[in-house]
Design a protein with these regions (language model features):
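Active-site helix of classical SDR
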Residues: 127, 163, 171
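Residue(s) in the substrate-gating loop at a strand-loop-helix junction
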Residues: 147
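Conserved glycine-rich cofactor-binding loop
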Residues: 11, 18-19
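Conserved glycine-rich Rossmann-like NAD(P)H-binding loop of the short-chain dehydrogenase/reductase
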Residues: 32-49
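Short, small/polar-rich loop/turn modules that mediate ligand/substrate recognition or access, typified
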Residues: 179, 184, 251-253
Length: 265
């Protein structure tokens, strides 16, 4: 009853999955026997090696689509390619995200627009493209990777906080619209996870706050989480697999915190 065998043979599209959280979730699907479409930035040779390694390790089909998450047409093509090449689409993970750290009065307008586009609007465009396919199939699972910053705020992250709050609101709306279609939509709200985006944040926070990187790590990054450690990608993957399995059918329109107690404070 509690095996994840129902994921075998399914198809997942995971945006922002060439590293970090996205890659961990894509790997979790593949390890359960599901086919995967990767997407994200990076060196093309490294991305191809990642794709080939994941396919070889798990024996499933793994594709890569280079969709730019600021371009609605490319996002729609990514979803359509998964359906066309792999025959179906069962799981959509909206994970792509970027960050910029700056006070509101100095926040560059182009950085604001890009963060809203990638962190929020891409979630809308991918979901819009996926819904008709999932409806036709009679089942679907949409998981949006929000953040603890979708529930609380921190200084110098206005665009990121606004986008992630928006993701949670969008998640609830989609869940209500599709509640009788056997399609669920949920959000996972991680705390700080040791990923490339967090590594860059440490440098940016040090600059903005006039602190050393070590002090940022101790007092700002891990200081937010009562456990005083990073959330692991395996911990996120465990929750994710539940949400996309048949056992997660009644989890809908919810946000799930995995933040070491950060948002309990």
């Amino acid at each position: 009853m509690f095996a994840m065998n129902d994921i075998k043979g399914q198809v997942a599209v995971v945006s922002g999955s060439t590293s970090g959280i996205g890659l961990a979730l894509a790997r979790a699907v593949a390890q359960c026997g599901g086919d995967v479409v990767l997407n994200g930035l990076g060196d093309p040779a490294v991305i191809e090696q990642t794709r080939a390694d994941l396919a070889a390790e798990t024996g499933v089909r793994v594709l890569y689509h280079p969709a730019d998450m600021t371009q609605p047409d490319q996002i729609a093509d990514m979803v359509a390619t998964a359906h066309r090449e792999l025959g179906r689409l069962d799981i959509l993970v909206n994970n792509a995200g970027i960050q910029h750290v700056e006070a509101v009065e100095n926040f560059p307008a182009d950085a604001w627009e890009k963060i809203i586009s990638i962190n929020l609007s891409s979630t809308f465009y991918a979901t819009k493209a996926a819904i008709p396919i999932m409806k036709a199939h009679g089942r679907g699972r949409i998981v949006n990777i929000a953040s603890a910053h979708g529930l609380v705020a921190s200084p110098f992250k206005s665009a990121y906080v606004a986008a992630k709050h928006g993701v949670i609101g969008f998640t609830k709306t989609v869940a209500l619209e599709l509640a009788q279609q056997n399609i669920t939509c949920n959000a996972i709200c991680p705390g700080f996870v040791e990923t490339p985006i967090v590594a860059k944040q440490i440098e940016d926070q040090a600059r903005t706050r006039g602190m050393t990187p070590d002090d940022v790590m101790k007092n700002i990054i891990l200081g937010s989480q009562p456990t005083k450690r990073f959330v692991t990608t395996d911990e996120l993957a465990g929750l994710f697999l539940y949400l996309v399995s048949d056992l997660g059918a009644s989890a809908n329109g919810s946000h799930f915190s995995v933040d070491g107690g950060w948002t309990a404070q």
